[in-house]
């Protein structure tokens, strides 16, 4: 679909050290690399280290910046986005997943009631609105995918901010 984009598949098995090694070798092979993606924030630390070691750790908009996106929304990703080094992250919200599961159990399942199908709203979460649908194994909450970027990375409702600031869980 995009003939001018060359996609490089470089498996790292989600391992930080492999991510670092593979990114360093890829930057050697392709010194003008334009973009990188990691399937999770934790191993993405290897990408950040490789970019730093090769002098490519540049802020968004700076000459030589490598577009950097990944998935999760951990505290480190929020930090990198707020500092301007990472472009964006697609968030997964494990805090909401757990809290909403408990909420549905307490409000409905423990009372022998069915979980209501339809709209779900809670302004406590950044995404605010979802939908409960009939799933293969029971009610399933569909939460819209959302992008964390420079415009919204400071929102205190992101799970990475809650885990770090409200719960005191340091990023390691």
Task: Give the predicted meaning of each segment.
Residues 26-33:
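Glycine-rich phosphate-binding loop signature in dinucleotide/nucleotide-binding domains
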Residues 1-2, 30, 54-61, 114-115:
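Alpha-helix termini
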Residues 37-87:
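Venus flytrap/periplasmic-binding-protein-like
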Residues 1-22, 37-46, 72-74, 92-97:
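Hinge/beta->alpha junction and helix N-cap segments in small-molecule ligand-binding domains
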Residues 23-24, 78:
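Short hydrophobic/charged patches on amphipathic alpha-helices used for structural packing
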Residues 39-51, 81-82, 88-115:
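Extracellular/periplasmic ligand-binding modules, especially the Venus flytrap/periplasmic-binding
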Residues 100-172:
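Hinge/cleft segment of the Venus flytrap/periplasmic-binding protein
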